[in-house]
Each structure stands twice: as structure tokens, then as C-alpha cells.
Amino acid sequence: RRVYIIGLSMGGMATFDLVIRFPETFAAAIPICGSVNPTRLSAAKDVHFRIFHGDADKSVPVEGSREAYKALKAAGADVEYIEFAGCTHNSWNPAFNYPDFMKWLFKQRSH
């Protein structure tokens, strides 16, 4: 199955939440400048993740994405974390322009 979810800011939070609630639905998730309670993420360990965040984000602290990455890694998930130096809350701009953004996404399939 190849169902993908991408969200930014509050949508990034919803991306994490939906994948935790319905992990069997999604092949891949790209939360951008989102956050989540990392203790919930083991439920999503079979979903491919690519997490983006700016290290200067004052709206959604970057620590949320850092902790999500650590929790997913600890659960054995296929996860990549990309942090943009000096980027504020609009990290979706460099994320959507990341060199292989769509190529990576469309390669993902459910386990």
C-alpha cells in the first residue's frame, strides 16, 4: 500500500497523531515543524518517517521533533530527521524544496 501523509505546524502534529492511531493505513509520513508526545510513537514504528524542523522555530519548539526522532529510532522505525539551521517556523519552504522530497516519498511502501 502507498498511502502518504504530510502536514505542517498543527498539521504536522496531526500527521503524527493519525499515524499513531492508524499505522496500518500509512506507508510514509512527513511531519514538518510538528510535535508529539514521543511515548506514543512506538505504535507507528512500521511507518517510514521523514521529519523536518527549523532550529530557530519559536512557534513549535524544535525539541519536539528531535524527541520524536529519538523515540522512533529507539522503536526500530525507518526514520530520517532533517533540521534546518537558522530556519524559523516556516521550515516547510526548505522541506518542500529538499532535493529528493518527492522521490523519497514515492519510493515508500507499507511493510
Name what the model sees in each region.
Residues 1-45:
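Primarily recognizes the serine-hydrolase "nucleophile elbow" in alpha/beta-hydrolase
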Residues 9-13, 34-38, 55-59, 86-91:
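Solvent-exposed loop/turn segments at secondary-structure junctions
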Residues 48-52, 58, 62-111:
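C-terminal catalytic histidine-bearing segment of alpha/beta-hydrolase fold enzymes
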